[in-house]
């Protein structure tokens, strides 16, 4: 079992803006409405085989919550929430069920990973989806300007290889942007100003957590 202490919080992406640092340099930041989250369950090695903390976020009409999940929130002594995430962390025992987690779990200068769902683009061709060059614009090319070209041989190998890059649905994928720096924490308003861009549209759900690799 890992002995790493992982911090994290669910929030909503509000959009991007720019602020100034101490040297009056422009810093592009993404504003995240972080939390408040509430602890709904503590996992322990003795009972569950691993150590983790479960966080819940977002209001939801109780009538839209099924009975098993309603019972789970009732047991924790909190009102039902829309989103739930579990973080494996060695210090899960320091949390308490019902405890509130706010943006102040992070400090300015902290390096974080941000997990979100990328914007859905719908069905896209190979030029947009994979950056293919396409066919010639002239010299006898007819009605195939944006087509991918050959996808394999004929008798040999007699099939299309797995993983062939082709047209299909693009976007709406789970994306993690690693090692972003928290530029500022607005404790009273629950805002995190994270340097750089993060995945997803405005209003999208994001998870801000301790970095999986590196970080300072």
From Swiss-Prot:
Entry's Gene Ontology molecular function annotations: rRNA binding; structural constituent of ribosome
Record family assignment: Belongs to the universal ribosomal protein uL3 family.
Protein name in UniProt: Large ribosomal subunit protein uL3
UniProt keyword Ribonucleoprotein, yes or no: yes
Cross-referenced PANTHER family: 50S RIBOSOMAL PROTEIN L3, LARGE RIBOSOMAL SUBUNIT PROTEIN UL3C
Assembly with partners or alone: Part of the 50S ribosomal subunit. Forms a cluster with proteins L14 and L19.
Keyword list, A-Z: Ribonucleoprotein, Ribosomal protein, RNA-binding, rRNA-binding
Organism: Saccharopolyspora erythraea (strain ATCC 11635 / DSM 40517 / JCM 4748 / NBRC 13426 / NCIMB 8594 / NRRL 2338)
